[in-house]
Amino acid sequence: MKTSDLLKPANREEAELLEKLDPKRLPNHVAVIMDGNGRWAERRHLPRIAGHRAGVKAAREVIETCARLHLPCLTLYAFSLENWRRPRAEVDFLMRLLREYLKRELPTIHKNNIRLLVIGRSEQLPEGVRKDIADAMRQTARNTGMKLVVALNYGGRAELADAFNAMLDHVRANGLSAFRADEQAISDHLYTAGLPDPDLLIRTSGEMRVSNFLLWQIAYAEMYVTEELWPDFSRARLLEALVDFQKRERRYGGLSSARGRGAAANGADGASGSERSEHLARSRRG
């Protein structure tokens, strides 16, 4: 099966990108830092809220595309713990926009067999938002298609702190002898327990930082950074990121296959191969 059988291209560029994609080598989990809504609006002399509304349209297209490509998991960074520092009017608008999105898009999400999950300190969100999130997760709980994970009131360091506190609670309840602290134990107590770690981390707006997002989980993720601001991140740009991902040789801290063969032939111990190269791809569009 070709990816073009899963997704009908809207134009020639999309058709060419789909031809390059191998449906058997798509990532299991794509995580996205959706950055640039405010700058998008400012460049057009519009209020920041206009950028956030445009960003919702981009998110809708990315969600639909990933679901049609049968990606198992997509995580979107929607609202960080630090975002509370923004002007009160902007924060209130973002909360209303989230509720509008859930009410409007939930039937489509459900129809496409997508399961909605929310990670973060949701107990600190407004009551109405919490209720709408709980209803949406309940209605999609039995869906077996793509998992759409929305990071709300989320921070990577806070997630690790919450995981460590959960492990301490486990020790208090069951005793230290029944617990072993290792990487798997930490993963099992994260908000994302049971989900695969991201294979591909996409960041828009050209910023070269991870912004306290999935700090534990992205240890071996491939990074794709594009200059596009989030509202301009189209389906073609997503396909471009997936094509780039499939060109990568994932090393997980080791040597590339070619270097590994050379080191073995020369009797080298390969110690330098423990330094993992980060791949930062820039798309100079826009």
Where on the chain are the PLM-derived regions?
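Flexible, compositionally biased loop and terminal segments
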Residues: 1-286
